[in-house]
Amino acid sequence: MKTKTDFLKMKEQGEPITMLTAYDYPSAKLAEEAEVDMILVGDSLGMVVLGYDSTVPVTVEDMIHHTKAVRRGAKETFIVTDMPFMSYHVSPQDTMVNARRIVQESGAHALKVEGAGEVISTIHYLTSAGIPVVAHLGLTPQSVGVLGGYKVQGKDAESAKKLIEDAKRCEEAGAIALVLECVPMQLAEFISKQLTIPTIGIGAGQKVDGQVLVYHDLISYGVNRVPKFVKQYTFVQEEIVRGISQYVTEVKTGQFPEEKHSFTMKEEECLALYGGKQ
């Protein structure tokens, strides 16, 4: 299993880091089989798995439950788990309780937190206690209400400078990596060159140290629309619907199950059961 030390070496050597979300045993198992470097158990599970309109309703218990399943499916892959909405915007003591629960109960190797400001002290607090933390800047889904929706961040010089400073502060606070979401590629490249820790982009262009996508977006599974920055590599949703539709048709028309899908009794046992009469 790769560790944070390996990810630092990958950045130094210019080897791109691959990260993918996973939310359950089968998706994690497939991600590991495909040799993904890092798995993110994102609170995006609230939208793509649980059917919420945002990530806000996701709880610590949800993250623990899903991370445990991912851990069972990907025992040899570095796993990062999101701290959900308001689980770290509380007192330092309560933040530590939530962080400890996720790490101890789920088996996550690192936690991810969104934003800067007061979150910088949270990063320092958690890393000082020995909990690896991945920072997340740019578009931060837990704060879309404040940001005015799902919009590109850092498009003007003033906001770009703030993101640069926030990124540096995240590294200084002890973050082991930084996710940059929906920021101009020029800004993402500049930030990546300023930091010694790896940057993982999602909608941040090519010049970052790695990429992350949502599992369901990448394979077109249960999604109707995807963001501009997503490339869909396969379309399993179409195959799944086709297969289920065929099943429904065959049951309705009596084509399924066939004899080969059924079990039988010996003739003498049938006679003993109902005398050969039905």
Curated annotation (Swiss-Prot):
Annotated disulfide bonds: none
Active-site residues from the entry: E181
Alphabetized InterPro entries for the sequence: Pantoate_hydroxy_MeTrfase (IPR003700), Pyrv/PenolPyrv_kinase-like_dom (IPR015813), Pyrv_kinase-like_dom_sf (IPR040442)
Pfam family name, one: Pantoate_transf
Gene3D superfamilies: Phosphoenolpyruvate-binding domains (3.20.20.60)
Reported cofactor(s): Mg(2+)
Keywords linked to the UniProt accession: Cytoplasm, Magnesium, Metal-binding, Pantothenate biosynthesis, Transferase
NCBIfam families recorded: panB, PRK00311.1
Quaternary structure note: Homodecamer; pentamer of dimers.
Protein name: 3-methyl-2-oxobutanoate hydroxymethyltransferase
Species for this entry: Bacillus cereus (strain ATCC 10987 / NRS 248)
